[in-house]
Amino acid sequence: MAVGKNKRLSKGKKGLKKRTQDPFSRKDEYSVKAPSTFAVRDVGKTLVNRTTGLKNANDSLKGRIFEVSLADLQNDEDHAFRKVKLRVDEVQGKNCLTNFHGLDFTSDKLRSLVRKWQTLIEANVTVKTTDDYLLRLFAIAFTKRRPNQIKKTTYARSSQIRAIRKKITEIIQREASTRTLAQLTKLIPEVIGREIDKSTHGIYPLQNVHIRKVKLLKSPKFDLGALLALHGESSTDDKGQKVEREFKEQVLESV
């Protein structure tokens, strides 16, 4: 047996083990607030590195996009398949004020809608709201059987598909171009779909008519006052107003 040093045993510590710092100790927690158009305002919490030197925490938060289920925002499980995107536009204190950034369907809902023996009709429309938001709305609809129909299939002719698509485009243009973004977000989930269904019934009966996606293409110049109004707040100094209302000047009747 060869006599020698066991390298593994004789190996000593070259240096002390580095002390690892918890990365969360350098972070702050901010609350994410949804616009007042939704029933539930508290979306959740988000983490960001504290302001150090030239790196401002507010700059890191602005522009963040959160995807939230519409069921959580409206306290209604019927909207569970809709996902709303909210973008942080302003940070006030520990609150992140968000604005609507888009809407989408869950993939499982979309897959469940597509079936055999029916025609899928899709349309997309680019519209501008009254407050200068440029949006692209994607509509989806499916044909259904007429009352007392014996035939298994419900295929629409090309001329009927074109007529339905034209009707969808007209309705979306009319509803979106005369409203603000906040008003439009209330209509998108159900109202526009029902309006399309009712208007196209004479061409071909439809089912599962939805605005499946909303894409924000362009936003107007940032306006803090408009964002605060959307969140039910005011950019004016409330303290000054309260003092004016409470204070009553005493008028002396006699000197």
Curated annotation (Swiss-Prot):
SMART domains referenced in this protein's UniProt entry, alphabetically: Ribosomal_S3Ae
Location of the protein in the cell: Cytoplasm
A Pfam family matched in the record: Ribosomal_S3Ae
Basic residues bias spans: 1-18
Key word Cell cycle present: no
Cellular compartments per GO CC: cytosolic small ribosomal subunit
Chief localisation class: cytoplasm
Keyword Protein biosynthesis: no
GO MF annotation: an example: structural constituent of ribosome
Modified residues annotated as N-acetylalanine in this record: A2
Region (Disordered): 1-28
Keywords linked to the UniProt accession: Acetylation, Cytoplasm, Ribonucleoprotein, Ribosomal protein
One annotated GO biological process: translation
Compositional bias (Basic and acidic residues): 19-28
Family under the similarity heading: Belongs to the eukaryotic ribosomal protein eS1 family.
HAMAP family assigned to the protein according to its UniProt record, in alphabetical order: Ribosomal_eS1_euk
Quaternary structure and interacting proteins, as annotated: Component of the small ribosomal subunit. Mature ribosomes consist of a small (40S) and a large (60S) subunit. The 40S subunit contains about 33 different proteins and 1 molecule of RNA (18S). The 60S subunit contains about 49 different proteins and 3 molecules of RNA (25S, 5.8S and 5S).
Listed name of the protein: Small ribosomal subunit protein eS1
Organism (species): Ajellomyces capsulatus (strain H143)
Lineage: Eukaryota, Fungi, Dikarya, Ascomycota, Pezizomycotina
